[in-house]
Amino acid sequence: MALGFRTTDHASLHGQYVSVGVRPGPGWKKQNVVDFIQTRGMACSVYGSQFLMDALYEANDAEYALHMLTKTDDRSWYNMIRVGSTISLEAWDNKYKPNQDWNHAWGAAPANIIPRRLMGVEPLTPGFATARIKPQLASLEWAEATIPTIRGAIRMEVENKADTYVLRVTIPANMDAEVYLPLPSGKYTVTNNGVPVKVAK
């Protein structure tokens, strides 16, 4: 018996953001998926928002991801603050789930998305022996973070201006790091502590 697939015109936000992580195969077009995701907004649960945000950063759509982190409608983390939650909600608002609890870890996606994706700090090897530092600030002009690891804190500050990009990073002495900078168009100079350096593209 041959396996076949039924075609359909239906597409869901959930199906699309999952596909960014699994890259289904020949014919799959990332930009088409990202374009569709942008038409749906936060049409997923608080739980699903974790996977949506990961997919946006994985697809290098940091600008839309920043928009989703900072938007203020009723399907937003801002709304959780506005309605009086001091932690994170089980659902976006009481109108979506009147019996929700107001102390729900699955609503706290920004707590890991900001350090891992926006600031771009992730372990490349076990125990953070080597870290990857790859900020994706999009139009955010400034960010600062202290990110704890088992080897000590990584401290970062990023200035992201039209004509200058400055990344200050301090890592523990027992850690190595691969540091990524955005590649600007046109002529540019990269310096490390004021000394020009060659850049691997």
Question: Each predicted region: which residue ranges?
Answer:
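Catalytic cores of carbohydrate-active enzymes
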Residues: 1-99
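Non-catalytic C-terminal accessory modules of carbohydrate-active enzymes
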Residues: 63-201
